[in-house]
Amino acid sequence: LMIGLLILNMVGVIDDLIRINYRRKFVAQIVASSFLPLSGLWINDLYGLLGITTLSPWIGMPLTVFVAVFIINAVNLIDGIDGLCSGLVGMGALVFGFLFIYNAAWLHAVFAFITAGVLCPFFYYNVFGKSKGRQRIFMGDTGSLTLGLSMAFLAISYAMNNPLIKPFSEGAIVVSFATLIVPLFDVVRVVRIRYFQHKPLFMPDQNHIHHKFLRVGMSHYVAMILILALALFFSFFNIVAVEYISNNIVIFIDIVLWIAFHLWLDRRELIR
C-alpha cells in the first residue's frame, strides 16, 4: 500500500504542477493498484453476487486491480466542488473504522481513523478557509489519487474473505463498497453519457452529480451537504439491508434508488 501511495503521490504532484497525459496517469494507477494483490490482498469471494462465490487468483487478482483503479478514478472525478471529495472519503473512512472495530480488525481501523483524521483540518480550510488570507487549501490530484487508493485498500480489505482480517460476513461485498456508491455510480453514469455522446471518456465535463445540483439552483455548500447526506444514506441502508435481504436485491435497490434520484434531479432541472 505504501509503495502504491508513494507512486500516486508523485504522479499527482507532477500532474498538479505541469499536467500529465491521462493515459500515463492511468498506467500509474494500474501499477500502484497492482501492489494490493501482489501483497496478498485481493477479492477472493463475491458472496453469491450474481450467483458467484469463491474466485480463483487468476480472476480475483485482475478484478482487484480493476476495482482499485475504478475507485481511484471515481474519487478523483468527484473532486469538483469544495469539501465534496474530502467529505465523502472522510465519512467513508469513519464508517470503515467503526466496521473494522466491530470486527476486531484493529490495524485496519487505525488506518481508517487516521485517514479520516487527516481530512478533518483539510475539510475545514477547504470549505471555510479565506482565500485572501491564504488560509484556503485545495486537494488536486495529489490528494484525490492517494485518497482513492486508500479507500480501495479499505474496501478490498473488508470485501476479502480472510479470517486473519475479520470474521466471515455474508454481506461483506455489498457493505465494503456502500460508502463509495455515490462516486462509483456517478462515474459509471458520466462515462456512459460521454460514450454515447462520442466524447473522450477521461476528459472533464459538466455532467457529474454536483453539476446537476448546481444547475437546479443550489449553492456549492448546499450541494456538498446534500451529496454527503446521500452517501451516508446509502452507507447505512446497505449495512442494515444485508442483514435481512440478499446481496443481489440490495444492489438492485441501490441502482433503482440512484436512477430515481437522477430522474427527480432531471425534472427539477427542466422545470428551472
Feature-to-residue mapping (PLM):
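Hydrophobic core of alpha-helical transmembrane segments in multi-pass integral membrane proteins
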Residues: 9, 32-38, 119, 250-269
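Extracellular/periplasmic helix-loop-helix junctions in multi-pass membrane proteins
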Residues: 235-253
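"…together with the soluble PPM/PP2C metallo-phosphatase catalytic core" -> "…together
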Residues: 1-187
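Membrane-helix cytosolic exit motif
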Residues: 185-200, 258-272
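Cytosolic, membrane-interface loops and tails of multi-pass inner-membrane proteins
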Residues: 130-135, 189-221
